[in-house]
Every structure is written in structure tokens, then in C-alpha cells.
């Protein structure tokens, strides 16, 4: 069941004297200056969000009804700080260690450190890692023991990449 706001009774007479004047229109909110049309906290408080509904009364006469909508909070829910304590840090906190991160993606990346899953495995020695960047760093240790594979035919220098060797040979 839909409940509508009360509407004053519609006069039976259609004479101009008997009709109610139309409700005054709310002035439009000023647009924010600058490249963005969204108001910022530096420009002052935001105008209230209004929901306008076109309704029809019992006699079939349309009228508008305006309500102020509640602002939805942005970001994670905020906790209240005890008196005398600094306010809560804004962000997303880790449920394991309570570290706070600015974005949910950073939190998700951090939570890998608490898991026992190690999906990245070294093909040379079988050692496993939680992050691909750690595996890449580890692979360099295998290359360091063997030394760079590309040796200059004109001098004792060695290079990891064949393109670097070719550039070096041109300098001779």
C-alpha cells in the first residue's frame, strides 16, 4: 500500500478566485564554479538532495511533492572515538591486524600476507611465494649464480639481455 502526503481538498468551482495558488517553486541551487560541477567541501556545505515526485490527487489534478533525501555515507563506516582520543582514521581496516588502508584494493592486497596460500612457484628450485613480485625477485638469485648469459666477444663484459649485448658491441 502506497501512502501519499495529504493534499488540500480540490475546490469544486473552477473560478480563478476559488483555486489555490500553485506552491512556490524552490530556487535552484547555484552551480559549483570550476571544471567540475560537483560541489566540494571547500566550496561550502552541499545542498540537500531533494526527491521530487509527480502525484495526482483524488480529482485527477497533478501536483508535485518534494522530500529531502538522506545522504548516503561514502566510504567505510566510521567508528566513534572515545572522549579524549583522536578521531578514527578514515579508511578500510584489516580484521586480522587492524592496519588501515585508503582503498579496498590496498586492503585486499594486504590480506594476502595473512593467508598461507603460496600460488607462485619457482620452476628452478620449487620454492613458493605469496606474491608474483617476490617470485620475480627470487628468480634473479638463480641468474646471479650462473652469471649473465650473454658475453661480449670483444671484452669480458656479460649481459642479461641480448639486446643490451648488441648495443654494447656497437660501441666497440
UniProtKB/Swiss-Prot annotation:
Residues 1-93 are annotated as: Disordered. Keywords: Chemotaxis, DNA-binding, Inflammatory response, Isopeptide bond, Metal-binding, Nucleus, Repeat, Transcription, Transcription regulation, Ubl conjugation, Zinc, Zinc-finger. Gene3D superfamilies: Classic Zinc Finger. It is found in: Nucleus. Residues 31-44 have a biased composition (Low complexity). It comes from the Eukaryota. GO terms for cellular component: chromatin; nucleoplasm; nucleus. Residues 19-30, 75-86 have a biased composition (Pro residues). A zinc finger (C2H2-type) spans 92-114, 120-142, 150-172. Induction: Up-regulated in presence of reactive oxygen species (ROS), like H(2)O(2), through the NF-kappaB signaling pathway. Up-regulated by sphingosine-1-phosphate (SP1) through the p38 MAPK signaling pathway (at protein level). The keyword Transcription applies. The keyword Cytoplasm does not apply. Its main location: nucleus. Expressed in endothelial cells. GO terms for molecular function: DNA-binding transcription activator activity, RNA polymerase II-specific; DNA-binding transcription factor activity, RNA polymerase II-specific; RNA polymerase II cis-regulatory region sequence-specific DNA binding; sequence-specific double-stranded DNA binding; zinc ion binding. Signal peptide: none annotated. Interacts with SMAD2. PANTHER family: KRUEPPEL-LIKE TRANSCRIPTION FACTOR (PTHR23235), KRUPPEL-LIKE FACTOR 15 (PTHR23235:SF120). Involved in the regulation of endothelial cell proliferation and migration. Mediates H(2)O(2)-induced leukocyte chemotaxis by elevating interleukin-8 production and may play a role in inflammation. May be involved in transcriptional regulation. This is Zinc finger protein 580. It comes from Homo sapiens (Human). The gene is ZNF580.
Amino acid at each position: 500500500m502506497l501512502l501519499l502526503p495529504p493534499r488540500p481538498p480540490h475546490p469544486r468551482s473552477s473560478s480563478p478566485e476559488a483555486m489555490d495558488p500553485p506552491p512556490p517553486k524552490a530556487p535552484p541551487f547555484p552551480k559549483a564554479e570550476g571544471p567540475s560541477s560537483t560541489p566540494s567541501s571547500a566550496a561550502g556545505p552541499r545542498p540537500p538532495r531533494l526527491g521530487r515526485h509527480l502525484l495526482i490527487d483524488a480529482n485527477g489534478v497533478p501536483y508535485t511533492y518534494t522530500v529531502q533525501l538522506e545522504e548516503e555515507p561514502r566510504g567505510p563506516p566510521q567508528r566513534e572515538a572515545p572522549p579524549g582520543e583522536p578521531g578514527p582514521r578514515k579508511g578500510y581496516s584489516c580484521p586480522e591486524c587492524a592496519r588501515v588502508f585508503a582503498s579496498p584494493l590496498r586492503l585486499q592486497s594486504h590480506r594476502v600476507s595473512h593467508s598461507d596460500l603460496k600460488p607462485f612457484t619457482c620452476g628452478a628450485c620449487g620454492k613458493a611465494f605469496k606474491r608474483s613480485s617476490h617470485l620475480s625477485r627470487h628468480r634473479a638469485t638463480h641468474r646471479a649464480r650462473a652469471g649473465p648469459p650473454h658475453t661480449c666477444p670483444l671484452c669480458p663484459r656479460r649481459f642479461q639481455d641480448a639486446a643490451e649485448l648488441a648495443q654494447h658491441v656497437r660501441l666497440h
